[in-house]
């Protein structure tokens, strides 16, 4: 089982981008030293409290300051960029990291970035599929042509090709019910979360992925990664109370975003967002602790993650150590250290 840290490069209101980068890079350095397997980088656009609109660029900076840790995107929002350019830049990162890059991709469940770039969100699913096809063709063919609804290229040659053969590992994020069996049929590793869907629902979604994966005849073991807020402290009371304000801030912010998106969308997407927002609104801190986060002493977190591993067939856990962006730096460091030294060894 692998373990990682999700890094959003968050910046408080009125903060300094340079400080946000420095603080995040310090976290990456500590993760490398403590033996984490992977750093996962977000992609945010038009978001004042995030400074990671270009995760490939940030990944190259991380490659230059680390030697061992895998650098993953979680996720690159493929429909927002020209897929040829993504193929070039991702392959370049694979080179400068000496083959330590993992290509995590998705289409995002939110419309804000699409609106900013002038791309209809209704096109996101088909754009994503075309973009992924273009990128894999670019990596595995000397020259190629492609004709789709949104992207067309004639006899192009993408250089460099990735270091990893045939290409970096591709992991696809899934949140909607219909996406899971599609991903299972394709056979790509899966990235999931518990933020907007109850654990029972995610369990059913992963089961549909597993069924489609097996029916498609894939021989490799399934690979399922869970992103989840994590907080570890030696004292039980501290572990249960210290992250409450920050973690609940994240869920309330997500609730408001889903409500706003639900009001803008039409048809089933609107209903789904509104339903998920209502589900989050009904949850208090005790509810969140039960199935949305992993918090407690090292022993408690081991037990929580063990249950999730069993229910969701997990092969990887990516921890969010500062969900909500209000955890003090010294508490993040303590939580990360305890996670690496006392939680991970029990779950390997």
Segment roles from a protein language model:
Residues 122-158, 200-314:
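An alpha-helical appendage that flanks or caps ligand/catalytic pockets
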